[in-house]
């Protein structure tokens, strides 16, 4: 699945000195429709990077003397977290973490491989 590439995030990046060319993604409504029809992989990385970049540019434009990464990375991380929360709600996945099956640790996998428990079974 494709990112939505929100216009407001493009505008924010460009407002604070970015030079992103006009681009489009898949609207959230279309992604939601795809989910209802079986799409199970949704990309939001581009949206996350745009949210972070916009905040970093804003902080540095508003505070050109700033050089402490904590001063611009904190609002950038907050913007990304806000976007992720929004997408989890829009895609009806908020509150589903308890349904994720436990993943084996690498140490447990190594133990099970060495005992042959994970050997392929040919019928």
Describe these PLM feature segments.
Residues 1-37, 42-45:
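Catalytic alpha/beta core domains of metabolic enzymes, predominantly
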Residues 26-123:
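C-terminal alpha-helical cap/extension of soluble enzyme domains
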């Amino acid at each position: 699945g494709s990112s939505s590439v929100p216009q407001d995030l493009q505008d924010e990046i460009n407002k604070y000195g970015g030079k992103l060319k006009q681009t489009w993604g898949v609207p959230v409504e279309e992604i939601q429709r795809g989910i209802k029809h079986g799409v199970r992989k949704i990309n939001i990385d581009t949206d996350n990077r745009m949210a972070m970049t916009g905040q970093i540019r804003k902080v540095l434009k508003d505070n050109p003397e700033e050089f402490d990464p904590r001063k611009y990375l904190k609002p950038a991380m907050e913007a990304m977290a806000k976007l992720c929360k929004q997408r989890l709600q829009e895609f009806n996945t908020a509150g589903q973490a308890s349904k994720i099956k436990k993943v084996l640790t690498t140490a447990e996998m190594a133990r099970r491989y060495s005992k042959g428990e994970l050997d392929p079974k040919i019928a």
